[in-house]
Amino acid sequence: GQIEHLGRSYAATDTSNYSVVGFGDIVYTKSPTGDFPYGIIKQSHIQDNVAVSPLYGVYIPVNYWLGYILHTYFQYAVNVTNYLLPIVHKGAKNTINISNEVFLSNSLYLPMDEEEQKRISELFIVVDREISLLQKDLEQEKLKKKVLMQLLLTGIVRVSA
């Protein structure tokens, strides 16, 4: 069947061992990238269910809020490394071998009260939105600077002393 991931379609001959990722699920990408030598752990914010290959670990948190706390915690490479280093085995060609059971075998100190989880994650959500807006503002300012520099360098705009 056709598998769609990140806007691209892939043909897979056998999808029987694929996992379904739902909104709010935690997804572990078992491939090293950049600052994340043991892979990336994120919460899915895609509204629709998505099929993913067995190269991804898919975990359903107790609730969305706890998932968001984990998503925020694992945004930092040091946290992912500290969590996975003791339990992961790197194989040939840097492949990461870890079962779902082993992935869940490590522990973190997390709030257990759902109301507390909700309040903490709502704070993270507000902060994430603020950061996103500030990044967009920064990109706009960089664009303005670029346009102004082009205008100045071409002599279209002159600065008076």
Where on the chain are the PLM-derived regions?
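A short beta-sheet element
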Residues: 19-79, 99
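Short, solvent-exposed loop/turn positions at domain surfaces
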Residues: 9-15, 92, 114, 125
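Amphipathic alpha-helical coiled-coil/heptad-repeat segments
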Residues: 110-161
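Short glycine/proline-centered loop/turn elements that form peptide/ligand docking sites
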Residues: 2-3, 33, 141
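Short, solvent-exposed alpha-helical surface patches in well-structured domains
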Residues: 69-72, 105, 119
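Sequence-specific dsDNA recognition surfaces
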Residues: 1-27
